[in-house]
């Protein structure tokens, strides 16, 4: 992923790259942007996620942005069931239904701890992010973020 980012952003010499385990990374500089993709859902609890959002906020320069692309839970059990069914249908177009149910769903249940999207937007606002919004969403996948005041 870093190689692809470097290639696509090569014309921007001011862009820096950091490769690190996000759980132990120290956000000790005034970052202009923090971007995450399919990572934060691995934090085990909502409290860990809230604390991590605070760390990101603290590490951003004023006006810095944070955007996260991740798996999210629906705002109700009804919606969550629809999202999971749509996800199963999507995966079944590329792999067998047996593989979906025998490999991918158990992997999701064992490794992923997504949180409700609405809760995450609320946490970000409580922490101090402004212009918090969802810029893309398709069932249980979303891209959302905000700006440090």
Model-derived regions: residue spans:
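A short acidic, Gly/Pro-enriched loop at the edge of an enzyme's catalytic core
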Residues: 23-34
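A short glycine-rich, Lys/Arg-flanked "PGG" loop and its adjoining helix->strand segment in the class I
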Residues: 50-62
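C-terminal alpha-helical "lid/dimerization" subdomain adjacent to the S-adenosyl-L-methionine
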Residues: 69-127
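Core SAM-dependent methyltransferase catalytic element
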Residues: 121, 125-149
């Amino acid at each position: 992923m870093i190689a692809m980012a470097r290639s696509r952003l090569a014309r921007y010499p001011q862009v820096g790259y950091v490769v690190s385990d996000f759980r132990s990374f120290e956000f000790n500089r005034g970052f202009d942007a923090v971007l995450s993709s399919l990572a934060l859902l691995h934090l085990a609890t909502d409290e860990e996620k809230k604390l991590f959002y605070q760390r990101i906020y603290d590490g951003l320069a004023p006006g810095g942005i944070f955007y996260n692309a991740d798996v999210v839970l629906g705002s109700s059990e009804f919606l969550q069931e629809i999202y999971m069914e749509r996800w199963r249908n999507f995966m079944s177009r590329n792999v067998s239904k047996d593989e979906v149910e025998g490999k991918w769903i158990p992997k999701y249940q064992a490794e992923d701890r997504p949180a409700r999207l609405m809760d995450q937007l609320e946490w970000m606002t409580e922490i101090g992010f402004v212009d918090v919004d969802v810029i893309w969403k398709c069932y249980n996948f979303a891209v959302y973020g905000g700006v440090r005041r």
